[in-house]
């Protein structure tokens, strides 16, 4: 899936989806819409490893803004035919799926959204942590995908001991500032926002 046909090596004989640049999130939202409406996403994975899926699903289905993220909606934005979108959704859940995204996606306006959506879609598929499944970023840019290489040690200064015990995920800074002292779930554990 790329505006450029030569993004994938020819030997893969891959089907090319000529997406309009910067519309990847719309495509993935429509794939999520299909998985939700077909009730074909991995509910066990979602319930065990994620927080907030009900709110996300409500958005995708158009319950919050009366704008469901249907394949028809996405096709108009992405230039990918509806049939290709629906077929791709089917393949996501019936085949081994690795969502590999280029780092270049985050260099656009609202560039965090395709990366967040890629992870969300990978969670819905439920193959994170399985051989050949899950998600990854920037594999095409590091020139060592699938190859072993020698790590060269970098010079660095000693770091010392970190005496800070409080922890919050960086994506929750706003929540911490707005809700000091409240608890939140992260990585299967409960934490408390510090009052700073």
Residue ranges and their predicted role:
Residues 113-123:
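Basic, amphipathic alpha-helical segments enriched in Lys/Arg and hydrophobic/aromatic residues
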Residues 4-94:
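Long, well-ordered, tryptophan-enriched scaffold segments
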Residues 66, 86-98, 183-196:
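Glycine-rich phosphate/diphosphate-binding loops that line cofactor/substrate pockets in enzymes
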Residues 73-77, 102-110, 141-142:
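Conserved short loop/turn motifs at secondary-structure junctions
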Residues 14-16, 95-99, 132-135, 195-196:
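Beta-sheet entry/capping signal
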Residues 1, 25-29, 123-196:
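Extended redox/cofactor-interaction regions of prokaryotic respiratory oxidoreductases
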Residues 42-43, 85-86, 98-100, 127-137:
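Acidic/polar loop patches that form or flank catalytic/metal-binding clefts of enzymes
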Residues 9, 27, 108-110, 145-146:
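Short helix/loop capping segments that flank catalytic or ligand/cofactor-binding pockets
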């Amino acid at each position: 899936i790329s505006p450029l046909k030569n993004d994938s090596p020819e030997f893969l004989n891959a089907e090319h989806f000529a997406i309009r640049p910067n519309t990847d999130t719309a495509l993935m939202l429509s794939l999520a819409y299909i998985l939700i409406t077909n009730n074909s996403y991995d509910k066990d994975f979602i319930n065990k490893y994620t927080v907030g899926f009900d709110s996300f699903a409500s958005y995708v289905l158009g319950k919050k803004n009366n704008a469901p993220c249907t394949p028809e909606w996405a096709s108009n934005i992405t230039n990918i035919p509806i049939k290709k979108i629906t077929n791709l959704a089917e393949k996501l859940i019936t085949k081994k799926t690795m969502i590999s995204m280029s780092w270049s996606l985050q260099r656009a306006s609202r560039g965090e959204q395709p990366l967040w959506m890629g992870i969300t879609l990978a969670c819905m598929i439920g193959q994170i942590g399985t051989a050949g499944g899950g998600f990854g970023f920037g594999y095409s840019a590091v020139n060592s995908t699938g190859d072993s290489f020698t790590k060269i040690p970098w010079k660095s200064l000693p770091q010392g001991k970190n005496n800070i015990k409080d922890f919050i995920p960086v994506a929750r800074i706003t929540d911490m500032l707005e809700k000091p002292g409240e608890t939140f779930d992260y990585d299967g554990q409960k934490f408390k926002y510090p009052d700073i």
